[in-house]
Amino acid sequence: SVQDNFIRF
């Protein structure tokens, strides 16, 4: 999901 992409940071 979009939020998962931010969690990588």
Swiss-Prot record:
Phenylalanine amide modified-residue sites: 9
GO biological process, alphabetically ordered: neuropeptide signaling pathway
Keyword field: Amidation, Neuropeptide, Secreted
Tissue spec. comment: Detected in the thoracic perisympathetic organs in larvae, and the dorsal ganglionic sheath in adults (at protein level).
Cellular compartments annotated: Secreted
GO CC entries: extracellular region
Family membership noted in the UniProt record: Belongs to the FARP (FMRFamide related peptide) family.
This protein's name: FMRFamide-1
Biological source species: Lucilia cuprina
